[in-house]
Regions:
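Short, conserved secondary-structure segments in the cores of folded domains
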Residues: 2, 28-30
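A residue-level detector for short acidic-glycine micro-motifs
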Residues: 5, 16, 41-44
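Short, structured beta-strand/loop micro-motifs enriched in basic residues and often containing a Trp
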Residues: 10-25
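C-terminal structural segments of small proteins and small subunits
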Residues: 11-12, 51-74
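Short, charged beta-turn/beta-strand-edge "cap" motif at the junction between a beta-strand
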Residues: 20, 44-49
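Short alpha-helix capping/helix-loop boundary micro-motifs
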Residues: 24-28, 45
Length: 74
């Protein structure tokens, strides 16, 4: 399932990030910790964005990007 569909406040493991055409966006996600094996938690949704907890930080990502991040419930 993709990250945009998960319930709030539950932990998920990133299993795959589908192809992102913009290299700078891909690099930014990588630098924020969005890599295979990382644990993420969606803490809220607001105006088409998700607030995600990853590696002890909270970051906002758009649903378009969240749809490319495939996760499994842990």
């Amino acid at each position: 399932m993709n990250l945009s569909l998960v319930p709030l406040n539950e932990d998920f493991e990133i299993v795959k990030i589908k192809k992102i055409k913009d290299d700078s966006q891909k690099k930014l996600l990588n630098n924020m910790g969005f890599v295979e094996g990382a644990v993420v938690t969606v803490v809220s949704e607001s105006y088409g964005n998700l607030i995600v907890k990853i590696k002890g930080s909270r970051v906002a990502i758009g649903k378009d990007i969240a749809m490319r991040i495939m996760v499994n419930h842990i």
